């Protein structure tokens, strides 16, 4: 029965290079996207290493907006998803 749950979880993840919609939010100065099609959070790789002053500007312009993102990496075992802005 546990294998059924694991398989069901795997099928709920996006594929690499999929383009989907996400709502942008920030946690601990890291930008994330809530993938509305998959009901999961994904880290946005475009904005991992940026200066603190740029973070504030990006927060003002991006947070709360729905944008298109491309899936870059998926860790099926941990359920982690990394995306980039299209």
Curated annotation (Swiss-Prot):
GO MF assignments: peptidase inhibitor activity; protein serine/threonine kinase inhibitor activity; RNA binding
Domain of life of the native organism: Viruses
Residues covered by the S1 motif domain: 15-86
InterPro entries: K3-like_poxvir, NA-bd_OB-fold
Any GO BP: symbiont-mediated suppression of host type I interferon-mediated signaling pathway
Keywords: Host-virus interaction, Inhibition of host innate immune response by virus, Inhibition of host interferon signaling pathway by virus, Inhibition of host PKR by virus, Interferon antiviral system evasion, RNA-binding, Viral immunoevasion
The protein's assembly and partners: Interacts with host PKR kinase.
Function: Viral mimic of eIF-2-alpha that acts as a pseudosubstrate for EIF2AK2/PKR kinase. Inhibits therefore eIF-2-alpha phosphorylation by host EIF2AK2/PKR kinase and prevents protein synthesis shutoff.
Family statement drawn from the similarity comment of this UniProt entry: Belongs to the poxviridae K3 protein family.
Protein name: Protein K3 homolog
